[in-house]
């Protein structure tokens, strides 16, 4: 079994103090997970590995400070056991966790307790998700976390920015529109590697998103295809936003707060020469959500999950049920939320529409696809698009500084 101790020496320079102890939210005892059953063996190993990792981390004291070596560390577990029940886990697999102490620290700064993280990911198999950036996505069964499949190159990119990302999160006290990165893993089943990164869900675990935009601030080749538009929840783009005459109706104070966060985060991305990111905008129509909820049976998590694959049933109604365990678990202990209401400690990317808006809406806004650095591929793409569209066209592949300027200008104009 892998050791979870720090690999840094006592003489290494200090990087950042761990956060001070905060008042913990009400917490519930959670049943130990014994079966890690999913339709995909990779997901079964992922659930097993997260459960094992958190159990091990709980035996290790939280370090007073993070050391430089913590940003390079990893733990690896290799299992060769033919006695495993193959219905639950493959007989040979590897589970590797990157920078466990760093992500543990980030989870704390984002207000996520390890036991809740463990329950959200390991109690029941993640479900196939959709719509928060590129790549294969899964959503935790309680819909609070996104598990995204990434490439080995993106793992390297994440390592390259992790120290600066951590410092940025410390400086802004966790108040950011950037993805909240919570863990990064490699799963090996039958000699095939799968890389996964876990993030907080930018959309609500409870309120259904009715319209969705991916905005880059460019109008060239930025319109949803006909194939995309017929989907149940299409991802619309910049041209669609303009053609639909869409606006975000928030108060002036909310707009200022949003733009302050956005400017701070974009400056951070420019410093790291990162570009091609988007603003993900999800819109919940409160009246429509209320109607859908009335038309449907009362949504809740029952024990009618598919016994073969352990997947929780996907509820397509105005608002989702809440899970008894995990990050959203304590919601059940407080007063029920009304239409369009949310807990800002869970739905951290959410903001209500302003009084007097044409209709009551809830907006979810965050930055996605933030691992693209300006390199030779981007330079080549920029040259090709310049030839095709002309030097003055608003193409998406430009230099990081130009990209940021255009992006901020566009986003500042999405508000009513």
From Swiss-Prot:
Entry's localization field: Endoplasmic reticulum; Cytoplasm
GO molecular-function term, one example from the UniProt record: 1-phosphatidylinositol-5-phosphate 4-kinase activity
Reaction(s) this enzyme catalyzes, per UniProt: a 1,2-diacyl-sn-glycero-3-phospho-(1D-myo-inositol-5-phosphate) + ATP = a 1,2-diacyl-sn-glycero-3-phospho-(1D-myo-inositol-4,5-bisphosphate) + ADP + H(+); 1,2-dihexadecanoyl-sn-glycero-3-phospho-(1D-myo-inositol-5-phosphate) + ATP = 1,2-dihexadecanoyl-sn-glycero-3-phospho-(1D-myo-inositol-4,5-bisphosphate) + ADP + H(+); 1,2-dihexadecanoyl-sn-glycero-3-phospho-(1D-myo-inositol-5-phosphate) + GTP = 1,2-dihexadecanoyl-sn-glycero-3-phospho-(1D-myo-inositol-4,5-bisphosphate) + GDP + H(+)
Domain PIPK, first and last residues per copy: 38-415
Post-translational modification: Phosphorylated, phosphorylation is induced by EGF.
Primary location recorded for the protein, binned into one broad class: endoplasmic reticulum
Entry GO CC: endoplasmic reticulum; plasma membrane
Keyword entries, A-Z: ATP-binding, Cytoplasm, Endoplasmic reticulum, Kinase, Lipid metabolism, Nucleotide-binding, Transferase
InterPro entries linked to this entry: PInositol-4-P-4/5-kinase_C_sf, PInositol-4-P-4/5-kinase_core, PInositol-4-P-5-kinase_N, PInositol-4/5-P-5/4-kinase
A GO biological-process term: phosphatidylinositol phosphate biosynthetic process
Enzyme Commission identifier(s): 2.7.1.149
Coiled coil: none
Function summary: Phosphatidylinositol 5-phosphate 4-kinase with low enzymatic activity. May be a GTP sensor, has higher GTP-dependent kinase activity than ATP-dependent kinase activity.
Protein name per UniProt: Phosphatidylinositol 5-phosphate 4-kinase type-2 gamma
Organism of this sequence: Danio rerio
Gene this chain is encoded by: pip4k2c
């Amino acid at each position: 079994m892998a050791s979870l101790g720090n690999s840094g020496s006592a003489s290494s320079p200090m990087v950042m103090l761990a956060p001070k102890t905060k008042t913990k939210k009400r917490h519930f005892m959670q049943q130990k997970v014994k079966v890690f059953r999913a339709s995909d063996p990779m997901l079964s190993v992922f659930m097993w590995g997260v459960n094992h990792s958190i159990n091990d981390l709980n035996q290790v004291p939280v370090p007073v400070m993070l050391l430089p070596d913590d940003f390079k560390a990893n733990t690896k577990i290799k299992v060769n056991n033919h006695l495993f029940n193959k219905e639950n886990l493959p007989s040979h697999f590897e589970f590797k966790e990157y920078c466990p102490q760093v992500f543990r620290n980030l989870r704390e700064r984002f207000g996520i307790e390890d036991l809740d993280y463990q329950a959200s990911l390991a109690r029941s198999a993640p479900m196939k998700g959709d719509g928060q950036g590129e790549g294969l996505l899964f959503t935790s069964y309680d819909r609070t976390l996104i598990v995204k499949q990434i490439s080995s190159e993106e793992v390297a990119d994440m390592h390259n920015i992790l120290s600066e990302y951590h410092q940025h999160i410390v400086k802004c006290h966790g108040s950011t529109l950037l993805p909240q990165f919570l863990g990064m893993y490699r799963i090996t089943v039958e000699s095939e590697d799968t890389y996964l990164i876990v993030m907080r869900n930018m959309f609500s675990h409870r309120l259904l998103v009715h319209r969705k935009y991916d905005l880059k601030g460019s109008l060239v080749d930025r319109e949803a295809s006909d194939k995309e538009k017929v989907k149940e929840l299409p991802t619309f783009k910049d041209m669609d936003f303009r053609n639909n005459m869409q606006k975000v109706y928030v108060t002036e104070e909310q707009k200022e707060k949003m733009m302050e966060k956005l400017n701070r985060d974009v400056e951070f991305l420019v410093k790291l020469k990162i570009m091609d990111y988007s603003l993900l905008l999800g819109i919940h129509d409160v009246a429509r959500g209320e109607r859908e909820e009335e038309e449907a049976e009362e949504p809740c998590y029952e024990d009618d999950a598919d016994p073969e694959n352990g997947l929780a049933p996907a509820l397509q109604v105005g608002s989702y049920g809440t899970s008894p365990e995990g990050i959203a678990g304590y919601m059940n202990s407080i007063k029920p939320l009304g239409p369009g209401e949310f807990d800002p400690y869970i739905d951290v990317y959410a903001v209500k529409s302003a009084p007097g808006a044409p209709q009551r809406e809830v907006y979810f806004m965050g930055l996605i696809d933030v691992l693209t650095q300006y390199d030779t591929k981007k330079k080549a793409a920029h040259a090709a698009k310049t030839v095709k569209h002309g030097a003055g066209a608003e193409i998406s592949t430009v230099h990081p500084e130009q990209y940021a300027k255009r992006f901020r200008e566009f986003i500042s104009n999405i508000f009513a």
